Swiss-Prot record:
Coiled coil: none
Catalysed reaction, written as an equation: Hydrolysis of Ala-|-Gly bond in repressor LexA
Lineage: Bacteria, Pseudomonadati, Pseudomonadota, Alphaproteobacteria, Acetobacterales
HAMAP family reported for this sequence: LexA (MF_00015)
Superkingdom of origin organism: Bacteria
Protein name as it appears in the record: LexA repressor
DNA-binding region(s) from the entry: 26-46
InterPro entries, per database record: LexA, LexA-like, LexA/Signal_pep-like_sf, LexA_DNA-bd_dom, LexA_repressor, Peptidase_S24_LexA, Peptidase_S24_S26A/B/C, WH-like_DNA-bd_sf
Length: 231
């Protein structure tokens, strides 16, 4: 049987994963549970791992995976039609095996170059290359890939050199990580926050400031659904 805080954290992580495709940062979990420090989150995650409810994948972006939920939480779990995917082991070997067994197991996405997870860069207009990924990594819809440049999203598990898989779209919910086009010139990867008639682009690194714009100056170009990291 889980404690109240363990139950709250597990349900929060599950809902965040299903809504955004990414596990929440420790700061987000701390705020969601109204705890004073991140050490409490570490203890709760450790307890959930020991009891077989949660798995933490070391050295991987967005490294939390919900293995199961308590029966009461599972019954109330909304059917969003989206389930996050985690790449395990050697990516290249698995993908080659998948292609040999089933050509439909891999899809090709346009790679539009580097996007700033630091200071915004000039908007990317033409794709420079292509990337092949497991089809199971993404859900329905049109997708593209961007290489992350910079460290402003490190607390969200997004590192310099990661490949971000983006679901193309012009809308996103507040709190989701999006590709934002500013003034039709700059493009950046940040967490979106709606603030009345303004839009805030929020980094996940205390070294960077939140940027706030009139809503009409920011256009959503898609939202983050997965990350791919090479070792």
């Amino acid at each position: 049987m889980l404690t109240r805080k363990q139950h709250e954290l597990l349900v929060y992580i599950d809902q965040h994963l299903r809504r955004t495709g990414c596990s929440p940062s420790f700061e987000e979990m701390k705020e969601a549970l109204d705890l004073k420090s991140k050490s409490g989150i570490h203890r709760l995650i450790g307890a959930l791992e020991e009891r077989g409810f949660l798995r933490r994948h070391k050295h991987r972006a967005r490294a939390l995976e919900v293995l199961r939920l308590p029966s009461d939480a599972a019954a109330d779990r909304p059917d969003t039609g989206f389930a996050p995917n985690v790449i395990r082991g050697d990516f290249t070997a698995r993908l080659q095996g998948a292609r040999a067994a089933d050509p439909a197991a891999a899809i090709t996405l346009p790679l539009y170059g580097r996007i700033a997870a630091g200071q915004p860069i000039e908007a990317l207009r033409e794709h420079q290359a292509e990337i092949e990924i497991p089809a199971s990594l993404v859900g329905p819809g049109e997708h593209y890939a961007l290489e992350v440049a910079g460290d402003s999203m490190v607390d969200a598990g997004i590192l310099d050199g990661d490949t971000a898989i983006i679901r193309r779209g012009e809308t996103a919910e507040t709190g989701q990580i999006v590709v934002a086009l500013i003034d039709d010139v700059e493009v950046t990867l940040k967490r979106l926050r709606r603030r009345g008639n303004s839009t805030a682009l929020e980094p996940a690194n205390p070294r960077y400031e939140i940027r706030i714009f009139p809503a009409e100056r920011v256009k959503v170009q898609g939202r983050l659904v997965a990350l791919f990291r090479r070792y």
